[in-house]
């Protein structure tokens, strides 16, 4: 019997529930149903999301705002490329640098102290992610207003969704964190990120996700990736079944240099994606083979069940037939027994046979259907019913019959009917002292 909470499920939802439980191995049916309901009963998305959760990757369809972003950044093999700002050149450059140094130091010190003190007054609003997609769209619009519409295609979704799409499609994910207050951000966006050759490389080889660290979603990603300076780029890919940072690019980098660094990172890690594709194909083939085996097993099971059903039906048919034959035999035996008892009763009720010397006696010779003859005497005053009872009591007589006289040829009314409620006597029927009567078999009529 289905559990009460499963009674409102359709047949299709029940099948998806059982299939999801089989694929994920979750024992709790309530948990399976809750997960499917979160994904609008999209079983493919629910299974993928379950696998992502097992590997520590946030959910694509319901990413919790407060959950830390699970990306492997502790790999010591991460390729890191940092571009330092150029040192001042010449007497004029060093003079300008030394003059501005106290002002910059004072400005950034006061700014840091102000931000630190502000945290005690009210929490950093960036720590609460309420609309991550809105943060992405807002940054994209501000980017286009400031630097134009010629830029790499922005991934219009949350960071978690970008990770999951890159994982599902086995593609590189390039993450750009924009520091609005950094002095190199404008030059990088305008001259490097929007360069045609950079746009072409990013759009054809990878997914591109970007956000400002002033936005809650960008700040959350910044806390996970721990950048040191801006502009900051991180290359992420599926490695050892986890989304892993395989490259970090920090500082003001030129277009050609950026292309070279990205190409180097992709070439160095391409084997991991190839290996993952092969493993995924092998898993898919194994799954297809298992599905085919399951289908073959189910087909064989259905065939066996059909055979068993037909056998049961045949056994049931034979049983009913045998039972019907047995009932017919019993009914026939009861009928014969009742018939024999009726014959014996009729025989016991017959009046005594008159003597041959009795002038009122009638000698009747009966010709039975089996060509045998029976002779008996009756009294003229007796009803024709007595003749019928006598013949009925005989072992040779049929079960149903009528008595016919030959001259003139007529049927004697021996049993009550509408025409003869009270059958006549032998004398009233016009019988003589010696008669030959014929017994006509009516059993089959």
UniProtKB/Swiss-Prot annotation:
Transmembrane feature ranges: none
Keyword terms: Acetylation, Coiled coil, Cytoplasm, Endoplasmic reticulum, Lipid droplet, Unfolded protein response
Record PROSITE patterns: UBX
Primary gene name: FAF2
MF (Gene Ontology): lipase binding; lipase inhibitor activity; protein-macromolecule adaptor activity; ubiquitin binding; ubiquitin protein ligase binding
Protein's recorded name: FAS-associated factor 2
Miscellaneous notes: Up-regulated in T-cells and eosinophils from patients with atopic dermatitis.
N-acetylalanine: modified positions: 2
UniProt keyword Translocase, yes or no: no
Coiled coil: 275-350
Residues annotated as domain UBA: 12-48
GO BP: ERAD pathway; lipid droplet organization; proteasome-mediated ubiquitin-dependent protein catabolic process; response to unfolded protein; retrograde protein transport, ER to cytosol; stress granule disassembly
Xref: CDD domains: UAS_ETEA, UBA_FAF2, UBX_UBXN3B
């Amino acid at each position: 019997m289905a559990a009460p909470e499963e009674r409102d499920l359709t047949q299709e939802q029940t099948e998806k529930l059982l299939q999801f439980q089989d694929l994920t191995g979750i024992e709790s049916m309530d948990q399976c149903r809750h997960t499917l309901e979160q994904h609008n009963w999209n079983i493919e998305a629910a299974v993928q999301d379950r696998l992502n959760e097992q590997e520590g990757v946030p959910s694509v369809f319901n990413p919790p705002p407060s959950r830390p972003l699970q990306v492997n950044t502790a790999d010591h093999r991460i390729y890191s490329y940092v571009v330092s700002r150029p040192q001042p050149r010449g007497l004029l450059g060093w003079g300008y640098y030394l003059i501005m140094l106290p002002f910059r130091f004072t400005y950034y010190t006061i700014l840091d102290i102000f931000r630190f003190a502000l945290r005690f007054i009210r929490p950093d609003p960036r720590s609460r992610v309420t609309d991550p997609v809105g943060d992405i769209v807002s940054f994209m619009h501000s980017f286009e207003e400031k630097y134009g519409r010629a830029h790499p295609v922005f991934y219009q979704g949350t960071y978690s969704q970008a990770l999951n799409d890159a994982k599902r499609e086995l593609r590189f994910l390039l993450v750009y964190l924009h520091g609005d207050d950094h002095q190199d951000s404008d030059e990088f966006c305008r001259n490097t990120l929007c360069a045609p050759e950079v746009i072409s490389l990013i759009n054809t080889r990878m997914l591109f996700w970007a956000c400002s660290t002033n936005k809650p979603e960008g700040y959350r990603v910044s806390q996970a990736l721990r950048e040191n300076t801006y502009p900051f780029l991180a290359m992420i890919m599926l490695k050892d079944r986890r989304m892993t940072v395989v490259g970090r690019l920090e500082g003001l980098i030129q277009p050609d240099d950026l292309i070279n660094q990205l190409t180097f990172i992709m070439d160095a890690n391409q084997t991991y994606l190839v290996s993952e594709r092969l493993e995924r194909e092998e898993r898919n083939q194994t799954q297809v083979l298992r599905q085919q085996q399951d289908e073959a097993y189910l087909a064989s099971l259905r065939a066996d069940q059909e055979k068993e059903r037909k056998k049961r039906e045949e056994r049931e048919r034979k049983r009913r037939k045998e039972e019907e034959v047995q009932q017919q035999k019993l009914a026939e035996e009861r009928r014969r027994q009742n018939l024999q008892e009726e014959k014996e009763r009729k025989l016991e009720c017959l009046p005594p046979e008159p003597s041959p010397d009795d002038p009122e006696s009638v000698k009747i010779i009966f010709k039975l259907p089996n060509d045998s003859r029976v002779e008996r005497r009756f009294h003229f005053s007796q009803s024709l019913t007595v003749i019928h009872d006598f013949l009925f009591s005989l072992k040779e007589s049929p079960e149903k019959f009528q008595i016919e006289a030959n001259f003139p040829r007529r049927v004697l009314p021996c049993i009550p009917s509408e025409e003869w409620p009270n059958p006549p006597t032998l004398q009233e029927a016009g019988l003589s002292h010696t008669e030959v009567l014929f017994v006509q078999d009516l059993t089959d009529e």
